A protein has these predicted regions:
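A short, conserved, highly charged catalytic patch centered on acidic carboxylates
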Residues: 1-119, 127-130, 134-195
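Charged, structured surface patches that assemble and position nucleic-acid processing machinery
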Residues: 124
Length: 195
């Protein structure tokens, strides 16, 4: 069986802190959990850069996973750094949808996304939500949930909320997929909504 983040002792320590420690240590551990998970799937050795955004939403922390877009034949100088994934770490006592609304208002002007699309991950305590951000959509329609497709009473649904301890294999699969593909490839080759 393939190893996941749950096999690493640091994640057990972070989970324990989030469940049992008083504030402000819980907040620090929530931010650390989001950052550590991203660093595991987007390592610097593969050309990824994880930075904290200057733009913050509703008291949460916004992280940007970026990569260089090369320009010219020499391939030496990056034209710009594109946002491949945006992550929002929201304290479990806060409403994460408020942070999403604020991000939606800021995103069209501020994010440097490639081809108008990128991944979005929201960490809310021990829950994680996965989205695709579509820059050219109207306000309120820029984020589409992505995850596991299922059917109920003949209707199709997308499950995009997962628990970091119980849904380890699914989260691992989604994070690995996000690390290896841009959103535009995902939209063309999967069950999710059109780009």
């Amino acid at each position: 069986m393939e190893e996941t983040y749950l096999d690493l002792p640091i994640f057990h320590a972070l989970f324990d802190s989030i469940k049992n420690d008083p504030e402000p240590q819980r907040s620090v551990s929530m931010k650390g959990l989001g950052t550590a998970l991203l660093a595991g799937y987007f390592p610097i050795i593969n050309g990824w850069i994880i930075t904290q955004s200057r733009i913050q939403a509703a008291g949460s922390v916004v992280l940007r996973v970026q990569h260089y877009l090369r320009m010219g034949r020499d391939g030496q100088r990056p034209a710009r750094i594109a946002d491949h994934l945006l992550a929002c770490v929201v304290h479990d006592t806060q409403d994460w949808s408020n942070a999403m609304e604020e991000l939606d208002g800021l995103s069209a002007e501020r994010w440097n996304v490639e081809n108008g699309y990128c991944w979005v991950v929201v960490f809310h305590g021990l829950d994680v939500y996965f989205f695709c951000y579509r820059q050219n959509r109207p306000f309120g329609e820029r984020y589409a949930g992505c995850g596991t497709r299922f059917f109920e009473n003949g209707e199709e649904f997308i499950q995009n909320k997962y628990h970091l301890q119980r849904d380890t294999a699914l989260i691992h699969e989604i994070m690995a997929f996000m690390a290896s593909r841009t959103y535009i490839l995902y939209a063309k080759n999967s069950f999710n909504t059109e780009p």
